[in-house]
């Protein structure tokens, strides 16, 4: 695992207008999901299957795409659309960043784990 974030990677994220992110599996994403969203860039992301508290909303916090052949054609069109619409792109990127900072930081994950353990222990 990583012990930190390479400054070059961080600079690349924060300098980007658009970040194309693919989840490593269909569940709740990984650290890069939240890193990309916290950059403030517009993030294109394949949807996650696992229901999470405070889910991302397509078109509000990020732009979703699917991995089908037709989905890839639509993805290209969406990227071109947002490249030329600074205000929309920046608004979604800003809202995504705000959403992640409010609901998806490490402390939120820790609290979810504690809540799940407490609930499991209450049922024992």
Roles of regions detected by a PLM:
Residues 3, 7-124:
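Catalytic binding pocket for nucleotide-activated donors in carbohydrate/polymer assembly enzymes
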